[in-house]
Amino acid sequence: MSKLKVTNARRKQRVRLSLRRTANGRPRLSVFRSSKHIYAQVIDDLKGETLASASSLEKTMRDAGNTGANIDAAKAVGKLLAERAVKNGVKEVVFDRGSYLYHGRVKALADAARESGLSF
């Protein structure tokens, strides 16, 4: 395993451990980004189910022109995810950035989710 993969795996493990300690039963907003798309979901770890999800692959995103891996698509995904989560009764979450730094697309998604009604 390369040094970069080891570093990312350790960072991801460290972030998830700190989230478990501070979650207090709140669902987790998990983010995954690839080179072409961005995905986000709100997960209830106690029940083991996904409460809301959104990605840049969805038809509504493609019709709006927000496809791909740019900051505008991340903002649209964050807004859509927050709307779906609030509709399902979720208002407070913990933000799980995984091994990604809080910068760029990850930060844009988080800010859009906050503006649309989620608090973390």
Curated annotation (Swiss-Prot):
HAMAP family: Ribosomal_uL18_B (MF_01337_B)
Taxon lineage: Bacteria, Pseudomonadati, Pseudomonadota, Alphaproteobacteria, Hyphomicrobiales
The UniProt record lists the keyword Signal: no
UniProt keyword annotation of ATP-binding present: no
Similarity comment: Belongs to the universal ribosomal protein uL18 family.
Protein name in the entry: Large ribosomal subunit protein uL18
Gene Ontology molecular-function annotations: 5S rRNA binding; structural constituent of ribosome
Gene Ontology cellular component annotations, sorted alphabetically: cytosolic large ribosomal subunit
Biological process, per Gene Ontology: translation
Name of the gene encoding the protein in the UniProt record: rplR
PANTHER family in UniProt: 39S RIBOSOMAL PROTEIN L18, MITOCHONDRIAL, LARGE RIBOSOMAL SUBUNIT PROTEIN UL18M
InterPro entries: Ribosomal_uL18_bac-type, Ribosomal_uL18_bac/euk
A Pfam family per the record: Ribosomal_L18p
Function of the protein: This is one of the proteins that bind and probably mediate the attachment of the 5S RNA into the large ribosomal subunit, where it forms part of the central protuberance.
Keyword terms, alphabetized: Ribonucleoprotein, Ribosomal protein, RNA-binding, rRNA-binding
Taxonomic source organism: Nitrobacter hamburgensis (strain DSM 10229 / NCIMB 13809 / X14)
Assembly and binders: Part of the 50S ribosomal subunit; part of the 5S rRNA/L5/L18/L25 subcomplex. Contacts the 5S and 23S rRNAs.
